[in-house]
């Protein structure tokens, strides 16, 4: 399959969305607060998401209000909006 085909692009989007949900669920399962390095390790081991895509994912979480990020401690905290997102069916 051509990686630029509409089908391939759609599969990539679906994969990334599954990864996003899984990373948020992992954050929730760990008490709702984790250091960014722990989230990065999880996403890399489970989904092979490297640094740049992980950064895009985290920026999306913060911009959507699903996660708050503390630059001083490098901790990500799941918000109420993040919990509501996880409560919705995938």
What do the predicted segments below correspond to?
Residues 22-30, 42, 85:
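Short amphipathic alpha-helical elements of helix-turn-helix/winged-helix folds
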Residues 62-72:
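A short, conserved structural fragment
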Residues 35-36, 56-58, 73:
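A composition-biased, non-transmembrane "mature-region" signal
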Residues 33-43:
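Short acidic, hydrophobic short linear motifs in intrinsically disordered regions
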Residues 74-80:
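Minor-groove-contacting beta-hairpin "wing" of winged helix-turn-helix DNA-binding domains
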Residues 1-26:
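Short alpha-helical segments that sit at the start of domains
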Residues 48-63:
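Short amphipathic alpha-helical interaction segments
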Residues 83-90:
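Short, amphipathic alpha-helical interaction segments positioned at domain boundaries
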């Amino acid at each position: 399959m051509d990686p630029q085909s509409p089908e391939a692009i759609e599969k990539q989007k679906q994969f990334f969305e599954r990864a996003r949900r899984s990373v948020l669920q992992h954050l929730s399962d760990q008490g709702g607060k984790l250091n960014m390095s722990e989230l990065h390790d999880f996403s890399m081991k489970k989904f092979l998401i490297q640094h740049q895509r992980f950064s895009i994912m985290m920026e999306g979480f913060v911009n959507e209000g699903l996660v708050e990020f503390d630059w001083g401690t490098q901790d990500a905290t799941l918000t109420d909006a993040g919990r509501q997102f996880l409560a919705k069916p995938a």
